[in-house]
Amino acid sequence: MRLAGWGLRWAIALLIAVGEAAVEDNCGRNEFQCQDGKCISYKWVCDGTAECQDGSDESQETCKSVTCKMGDFSCGGRVNRCISGSWRCDGQVDCENGSDEEGCSPKTCSQDEFRCNDGKCIAPKFVCDLDLDCLDGSDEASCPMPTCGPANFQCNSSMCIPQLWACDGDPDCDDGSDEWPKHCGTPHPSGPLQDNNPCSALEFHCGSGECIHSSWHCDHDPDCKDKSDEENCAVATCRPDEFQCSDGTCIHGSRQCDREPDCKDLSDELGCVNVTLCEGPNKFKCQSGECISLDKVCNSVRDCRDWSDEPLKDCGTNECLDNKGGCSHICNDLKIGYECLCPEGFQLVGKHRCEDIDECQNPDTCSQLCVNLEGSYKCECEEGFRLEPLTKACKAVGTIAYLFFTNRHEVRKMTLDRSEYTSLIPNLKNVVALDTEVASNRIYWSDLSQRKIYSAQIDGAPGFSSYDTVIGEDLQAPDGLAVDWIHSNIYWTDSILGTVSVADTKGVKRKTLFQEEGSKPRAIVVDPVHGFMYWTDWGAPAEIKKGGLNGVDVYSLVTEDIQWPNGITLDLSGGRLYWVDSKLHSISSIDVNGGNRKTVLEDKKKLAHPFSLAIFEDKVFWTDVINEAIFSANRLTGSDISLMAENLLSPEDIVLFHNLTQPRGVNWCERTALRNGGCQYLCLPAPQINPRSPKFTCACPDGMLLAKDMRSCLTESESAVTTRGPSTVSSTAVGPKRTASPELTTAESVTMSQQGQGDIASQADTERPGSVGALYIVLPIALLILLAFGTFLLWKNWRLKSINSINFDNPVYQKTTEDEVHICRSQDGYTYPSRQMVSLEDDVA
């Protein structure tokens, strides 16, 4: 009997142990088990927010046992969080207790740098250059009066510029003295603005040289850099029965304080006092309209005209005692009636039921990834980023991020914490557009005065001999520039020609993709991962356009509430576009399909005339040509506006240089068996609209068309000769006349001589007169050959009938050369038949 009792006890103990083990094994390998049995991700343990209802994931005992992996830094303290080792002593506090910035040695500048009194390092050429580059101004303290060398011109402001820039029709001194008549005499005939007024009849010519819409002249909002569009304007006066808005416009007096803004600056609704409102926890609105204090309700004194403050049945009754009044979560008893409330993270649906709020529906809830939980949410980061414990923002891990920006005569480089600030490419004329290729460590820029696009290795950029001219002709105003880092192409806009063009990064092959009369394309950004490009256009009407990187499927993405769109950038991981509007003084964002539009920031002072912007982590950076400065702000909320650099000279484009901004992708033009995708000229990525979309299409230079095989190129004269019967051809816009001959590569393994369009056309013209005479010679010979071939086939057929054989069908060998190049059967390269010529002959020769 005693043995049976012991056996029963052992069995019960074993069952309990197995049950406990089963509970412990409920969670996966990468999960943490709360004390109540709930499983959460190990990434959420000791991150400052309790996911376990019992708080065991944030307890001191749990966090003490956390060990940081190699390369990480332990914050220590009660929470003991782990951060990236690269965040240690980076000038930004990441641990709650600030331990990551304790005991850090002062930053040391290199031998070829100047150290400001505040510890910032700048290039020595910035010292005593009349610009405050140190935030404390120490780089301009105790400077002697500057004297210019023999090869320089000294401006009236003592600034020195190269002598070649003086009297060239383009002001380079900050006071414009290099173009004053007393120095130059008559205007220089070869200046960039040979026409005294390059603006159209519908535009206003600013004194500083820009062209703006005529409707912006005298609208009480300066748009010119020198504010000349608001000079000598008549002052508007309003009638006695009108209200004058802060911008000077007049509206009828009855529209003031009507709860609907009628002034553009909303000044008609400022300072209004609404006496009819009855809101707040201590107010009660009678059914007869009066507003009384809540302490007068159910006090046996009738204060409302209709006695609605003293209902006999409701006063003194607590409806929450009966099944919580039907509320699913919280019932709050009121003096009259009751109300259902919801805990944080839930919302009331109807009058009684609470439902979880999906915070992740808002794209700005988290900086990158959002995980919705019951009653809460969790933010996570993309690969290459880690969640910062203090701010809950995603911070990049790895290389140092730099801002590259144009400063009229140079390109400068600056770290995000402003600890390093140097000149990257000096001695330029008028650099406007800028972009980089991180993998090759190369930078590209356009010069508005030289009307060229250049490139250089970033490490060797200061040496002028290392510059490469990528595009050196047929440019008028290359205002925007973008690099396709996957397919090694560059895209640029030309606001005077109204074009968007593409070329390989060597500049050997180029093509005009888009041209429209009246358009003024400005900034451009590319998404080579998905095959799209986006650009701003401040023509009439102003809009933001989207199209494929091969020039197809172009349409307007933003057409409303947009006036002067300038810079544009893409948050590739978040799938959102950001742009600045110089007329609306705003930064806005929208998803890549045109939805979920949001205004990030509106500020007439900090966004007086924004020109370009860049995005990284949770920050947006922008240049402003009127403030002559660079600012930053939180890209989700528009808060935390900071001054990054000031006292600049016409800062225009800005890009962020970091390896995470240009993720790797597949270059399908190089994945096929044929070189360059089998294309004779350009192989361009196609937009990935759906899973069946082509990976690329072939393109020909301006003035040439695709042949029937959709790979070879024909001149327009040849296509007219070889076309049989009527055909429908969708023409692409032809850009400016090229003087250089386009380089045509071979399709498949056929060697073709490289020749210009004129050579191809002239060859076709010289061969055409002798073709009729050749028919009299070739035709009889061809008939004899056909007769002999037919006789051979008859003999072979008779011979095969007398031979026994077994045949095996092999579908691989049944595939003909025609099948290989047929556009509908190719697994990689396709085209859009409705947009291409399909009636041309294959035989070009």
From Swiss-Prot:
LDL-receptor class B repeats lie at residues 441-487, 488-530, 531-574, 575-619, 620-660. Residues 796-845 are annotated as: Required for MYLIP-triggered down-regulation of LDLR. Residues 22-774 are extracellular. Residues 796-845 are cytoplasmic. GO terms for molecular function: amyloid-beta binding; calcium ion binding; identical protein binding; lipoprotein particle binding; low-density lipoprotein particle binding; low-density lipoprotein particle receptor activity; protease binding; very-low-density lipoprotein particle receptor activity. The keyword Repeat applies. SMART domains: EGF, EGF_CA, LDLa, LY. One of its GO terms (biological process) is cholesterol import. N- and O-glycosylated. Ubiquitinated by MYLIP leading to degradation. It comes from the Eukaryota. Residues 712-753 are annotated as: Clustered O-linked oligosaccharides. SUPFAM superfamilies: Growth factor receptor domain, LDL receptor-like module, YWTD domain. Coiled coil: none annotated. Residues 717-733, 742-757 have a biased composition (Polar residues). Residues 316-355, 356-388 form the EGF-like domain. It holds the Pfam family EGF_CA. The keyword Zinc does not apply. It is a single-pass type I membrane protein. It is found in: Cell membrane; Membrane, Clathrin-coated pit; Golgi apparatus; Early endosome. A motif (NPXY motif) lies at residues 808-813. The NPXY motif mediates the interaction with the clathrin adapter DAB2 and with LDLRAP1 which are involved in receptor internalization. A few residues outside the motif also play a role in the interaction. Interacts (via NPXY motif) with DAB2 (via PID domain); the interaction is impaired by tyrosine phosphorylation of the NPXY motif. Interacts (via NPXY motif) with LDLRAP1 (via PID domain). Interacts with ARRB1. Interacts with SNX17. Interacts with the full-length immature form of PCSK9 (via C-terminus). Interacts with PGRMC1 and TMEM97; the interaction increases LDL internalization. Belongs to the LDLR family. This is Low-density lipoprotein receptor. It comes from Bos taurus. The gene is LDLR.
